[in-house]
C-alpha cells in the first residue's frame, strides 16, 4: 500500500460503516414494515377480503405494468395519479359526507367550520385507530366499508372499459381494459386500499402513520412529522459542513507534481497494438448508439401520450402499444445502452492494463457476451410487452413478463440472465487484468480498478432479493440497492477509476494523482452513498430512524459535486495540453458535459428532492423527472457517449471524426436536454409542487389539475427540446456508423 495506505483505510472504513448501517437498518425495514392483515372484516365478523386477495391484487397490478401506470406510495410514472393518494382522498371525501349526514343531515361541504372540524376529528380518529388486532385482522366500520366500496368501484371501472371513464383513461394515458379480468381488478383495488390503509393508520408507539404522514392530505391533517422537518434542517447543516471540509482538504491536499509532468510527444495508447478482443468492440458501439436512438424514440412517444393519452397524432396506438410499454422500453433501453457502454469501456481498458495482451479465448468471451446481451434485450422487451398485453399466463408474468417495478421491469428470468451476463463480464475483466500484477512497479491503481470492477459485477444481485409478493417496503429497499447503490454509487467509482487509468496512461496525469483520485473517490462517493440509499424510502413504510439516516447521509452525496467545475476545467486543460489530444476532443467534451450535468442534475435538482420535508410534498411529481433526466442522461449518458467515442477513436484510428457533425450532435444533445427541462418538466414540477403544498398531493396529480391549458401547453413545449435532442442523437449515431463502416485504408 505504501503512501496510499491511508486512502485504502478510508475506503475500507467507509465500506464497513456504510454497509453496517445499511444492513442493520435493513432489518428494521423487515421488522417494522406495515402489516398485511390476514383479513379485513366488518364489525359483525364478516370477512370482506383476505391477505391472499391483497397479494393476488399486487400480482394483477404488476401485470398492468405496475409502476409504469401511475404511482403507488409515490414511486412510478407521473402521468396518471398516485393511486395511494388518489384513493385516500376519494375515500375520505365519501367518509366525511357519510359522517356529516349522520350527524347534521347535510354534506360535508355544506357545513360550517365548527361542524366540519367536529366531523373531521371523528374521521381522523377512526382512520388513525384502524389498527391490526391480535388475530391479525382489521375491523372496518359500516361507514368506511361503504366509502371503500364506492371508491373501489371507480378503480375497477377505470381499469376496465366503462365508457363513462374513456376520457379519464385518455388523460391518464391508460388503454381500455388495462386489466381485462374483473376479479383481477377487484383484487387490485383491494391492494390499493391496503396501501391507503397503511398511509392513514397510526404506527403503534408513534404520533405518525406508517408512511410518516405521507401523502399530504388536508382532509386528514396529514402534514410533515417533526422528525421530517428537524432532519431536513440537519441535512442542510451537514451539507454545508461537508462542503467546507472537502474544499479545505482539497485546497491543502493539492500537490504540484502535475506541473512536473513531461507530456508525451505521441498518444501512448495509439502506440499499443490492439488486441482481437478490443477490435471486437465495434458491434458494441453500434448497438449502444442504436439503443440510444430507440430509447429517445420511446421517450418521444411517452411524451406525446401526456397530451394525447390513447393515440399518437390521431393514430389509435394505445390499444396495441400503450404508455406503460413505451415507458418500460424507454427506461430499460436507457439502462441497457448505458450499462453496455460501461462494460465496453472496461473490456477496452483491460488489455491495456495487461500490457496490450489478451488472455486465451478473450475475444470469444467478448463475442459471447455481446450476443447474450442481444438476446437479453430482445427477449426482455418481448416479455414485458406480452406481459402487459396479458398474453403470458398470470402465474408466469413475474418470471417472464413485467415485474411492475420501475427500472427493474424485466421478468425475473430475464433479470437472472442479465446478472449472469454481468458476472461473465466480471470474469472476462478479472482474467484480463490479473496478469498485470506480474509487472514491475506500483499496483495500487490496478487494485483500485479491480475493486471497482468487482463492485459493479456483484451489486446488481440485490435486485433478486425480493419476490412477486414481497412487501412494498422490502421490495423498495432492495430495488434502491440497484438503482441508487449500483448505478449512482459503484458505477460512479468505476467511471472515476477508469478515467484515472486512461489519463495516467495518456501521460496527462501523474500516477500518484491518478491513484489518489481513484482510491479516494471510493471513500468520498460511498460515505454518503451507501447509507444515503435510505433517502428513497422516507414514505414507503419505514420508521423515523431510517428517515433521519437517509436525510443525513444523502446530504453528503452532494458534497463532492462542488468541485466539478474544477474537474471540468482540468478536462478542458488536458484537451489543449498536447497536439495529439485534438483527436480525443469529443470524448473529452462529453466528460466536460458530465461535470456540468453532475453539478446541476445530481447536485441542484437532486438535493431539491432530497430533504424529507421537501420530498413529503413533491414525491412523485415532475420535479423527480427533472432529476432523473438530468442525472441519468446528463451524467451517465454523456459519460457513456464519451466512452463510445473514445473506444471508436482507437479501434478505427485511420478514420477521422467529422468535426461539424460531432459539434452539432454534442450541442444539440446538451441544448435539447436543457430545453426539455427548463421549458417543460421543471415548470410543470414547480406548479405541481405549489398545488401539492396548498391542496394536497392528490390534487397535484389529478385529472382536473393536470388538464389545465397551461400545463397542456407546457407539455407540448417539451416537443422543442425533445426534437433537438433526437436530432443530436441521430448525428452521433451517424458518426459511429461512418467510423465503423468506413473502408479500411
Predicted regions, residues:
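Perimembrane loop-to-helix junctions flanking transmembrane segments
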Residues: 40-45, 311-325, 617-620
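Non-cytosolic membrane-interface motifs at loop->transmembrane helix junctions
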Residues: 404-412, 441, 474-484, 541-553, ...
